[in-house]
Amino acid sequence: MTDSPTLALAKDLISRQSVTPEDAGCQDLMIERLKALGFEIEVMVFEDTTNFWARRGTEAPLFAFAGHTDVVPAGPIEQWNTKPFEPTIIDGFLHGRGAADMKGSLASMVVAVEQFIAKHPDHTGSIGFLITSDEEGPFINGTVRVVEALMARGENIDMCIVGEPSSTEYVGDVVKNGRRGSITGDLTIKGTQGHVAYPHLANNPVHSSLLAINELATTEWDKGNDYFPPTSFQIPNVSAGTGASNVIPGEFNVQFNLRFSTELNNDIIVERITNTLDKYDFEYDLKWTFNGDPFLTDAGSLLDAIVDAVGHVNDVKPALLTTGGTSDGRFIARMKGQVVELGPVNATIHKVNECVKVADLEKLTDMYERTLVNLFAK
C-alpha cells in the first residue's frame, strides 16, 4: 500500500537523526515543499541552531504553524523494539524518535497547507512557518531569536498553532490554550565550615535556613484562576557538605522552581521571595533563571477555528487546558497574538519506542487544514 503524503513525509523526517541542536536536513525537506507553494523562505542560523521563517502572502492577519525539527537522544538503543531512526509501522503505529514530538506534527502541517492551497489558492490572510532545531536543547538560539528578528521589523504573528503533542488519549482531545510561566532560583546560603563536635566555632547554613525554606515551600502564592491551577513551588535539588560525617558544611545550595499562573509575574515572585529570605538571619546569594512568562488565549478567531476543526474530525469538542511544562509558545506569545498548541498523543514522547498512531496523523492533517479553511477560505 502506498503511504499517504503525511505518512511519507513523517517517515522521511524521522529517518534523519536530528538530535538537538542538529537539523540533519529536515528543514530542507520542508523548505522544498513550501517553496513549491509560493512561500518566501528566510533561513536564520544562529551559532549551532538552524531556523527558518516562511511566509505566503502579505495580507493580515498572519497565521503561522510553529514547531521544531530537533529531537531528544534515543537513549538506550537495546531497549527499543525498532531502530529509533528507521521509521517502522507496527500494529498501526509509526515508531521512531520524533514520531510524536514532533515530526508527525510537522508532516501534518505541511500536507495540510498543500491541500488547503490546492483548493484555495487565492485565500485571504497570510500563512507562515516558524521552525527551529533548538527546542529540546537550551532554547537560546531557536524560536526566541526568530521572534526577536520578526518583532524588530514589525512582522508580528497574529495567530499561531504550535504542533506540540497536546493530546492525551486520542488526537485532539486536548488543545493547550496557554501555559504556565516558569522561573528557577539557585540559592546559596553561606555559613562557616567546622567540626561537628565544635558547633560554636562554626555556622551551619542548613540549620540557619530551614525555617526560611519551609516558609517558601508552604506559602500559598495564589489561588489560581479559571484557566490555571495555583502556582507551584518545588525544590528539585539540594546539596551541602563534603561527604564526611564530622564536618559542618560551609554552604547550603537549594534550587527551586515555580510554575506560575497569570496571577503572578517574574517581578512579583522575585520580590516576595527576597522579602521572605531577608527576614532571616543568614547571608545568601540568589541567582535567577527566567524560563518564560505564562500565556493564555482564552478567546478569539483562532480558538474558534480550532475547536470547530477538532469537533468536525472527532465529533467531540476538545478540552482547553493549560497543564504541562513550557513550550516555544511562550516566545511567540510575546507578539501579543493568539497562541494554541495542537498535536498528537503525548504518551510516548521522550521515551524508548516513541510512536504515534498512523490514523492520528491523518486526522491531525485534517484538523490543521480545516482550521485554515475556517480562517482564510474565500
UniProtKB/Swiss-Prot annotation:
**PANTHER family, per this entry?**
ACETYLORNITHINE DEACETYLASE, N-ACETYL-L-CITRULLINE DEACETYLASE
InterPro entries xrefs: ArgE/DapE_CS (IPR001261), Bact_exopeptidase_dim_dom (IPR036264), DapE_proteobac (IPR005941), Peptidase_M20 (IPR002933), Peptidase_M20_dimer (IPR011650), Peptidase_M20A (IPR050072)
Family per similarity comment: Belongs to the peptidase M20A family. DapE subfamily.
What name does this protein carry? Succinyl-diaminopimelate desuccinylase
Q: How does it assemble?
A: Homodimer.
- Pathways per UniProt: Amino-acid biosynthesis; L-lysine biosynthesis via DAP pathway; LL-2,6-diaminopimelate from (S)-tetrahydrodipicolinate (succinylase route): step 3/3
**Which positions are annotated as binding Zn(2+) 1?**
68, 101, 164
Instruction: Please name the NCBIfam families in this protein's record.
Output: dapE_proteo, PRK13009.1
* Reactions mediated catalytically: N-succinyl-(2S,6S)-2,6-diaminopimelate + H2O = (2S,6S)-2,6-diaminopimelate + succinate
Functional description taken from the UniProt entry: Catalyzes the hydrolysis of N-succinyl-L,L-diaminopimelic acid (SDAP), forming succinate and LL-2,6-diaminopimelate (DAP), an intermediate involved in the bacterial biosynthesis of lysine and meso-diaminopimelic acid, an essential component of bacterial cell walls.
Q: Which UniProt keywords apply?
A: Amino-acid biosynthesis, Cobalt, Diaminopimelate biosynthesis, Hydrolase, Lysine biosynthesis, Metal-binding, Zinc
Name the source's superkingdom: Bacteria
Cofactor binding summary note: Binds 2 Zn(2+) or Co(2+) ions per subunit.
Q: Which residues bind Zn(2+) 2?
A: 101, 136, 350
**What are the GO BP annotations of this UniProt entry?**
diaminopimelate biosynthetic process; L-arginine biosynthetic process; lysine biosynthetic process via diaminopimelate
Q: Where, by residue number, is the active site?
A: 70, 135 (proton acceptor)
Q: Name one GO molecular function term.
A: cobalt ion binding
**Pfam families found in the cross-reference section:** M20_dimer, Peptidase_M20
Cofactor(s) required for function per UniProt: Zn(2+); Co(2+)
